[in-house]
């Protein structure tokens, strides 16, 4: 199996079109505890370097820049409801504050 950190570096570039100088582990979470044992590891990417996306032909991923405050507002107003995304944003905000690090 591919080490988690190497997978995270690879997935970052493939899906966002960015590389980074370092990744910091933030948290792990289980997606559907009662249904399966799938776990997701969340990392924080720092010092992003533009690269190129390498998407599957059926994938469409648009990358946008958002402040932590704006992301939290989407959560609080019910406009962002994906549980893993909400958990990652709130964990980041709790650890680094609204302005990030």
Where are the model-predicted features located?
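C-terminal boundary of histidine-terminating zinc-finger modules
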Residues: 89
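Short secondary-structure boundary/hinge segments and terminal tails
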Residues: 31, 92-93
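Generic C-terminal helix-cap and adjacent flexible tail
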Residues: 94-101
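Unchanged
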Residues: 1-83
């Amino acid at each position: 199996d591919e080490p988690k950190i190497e997978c995270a570096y690879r997935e970052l570039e493939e899906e966002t079109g960015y590389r980074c100088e370092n990744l910091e582990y933030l948290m792990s979470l289980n997606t559907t505890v009662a249904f399966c044992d799938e776990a997701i590891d969340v990392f924080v990417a720092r010092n992003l370097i533009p690269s190129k996306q390498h998407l599957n032909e059926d994938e469409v991923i648009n990358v946008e820049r958002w402040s932590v405050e704006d992301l939290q507002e989407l959560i609080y107003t019910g406009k962002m409801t994906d549980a893993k995304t909400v958990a990652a944003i709130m964990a980041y905000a709790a650890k680094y504050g609204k302005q990030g690090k």
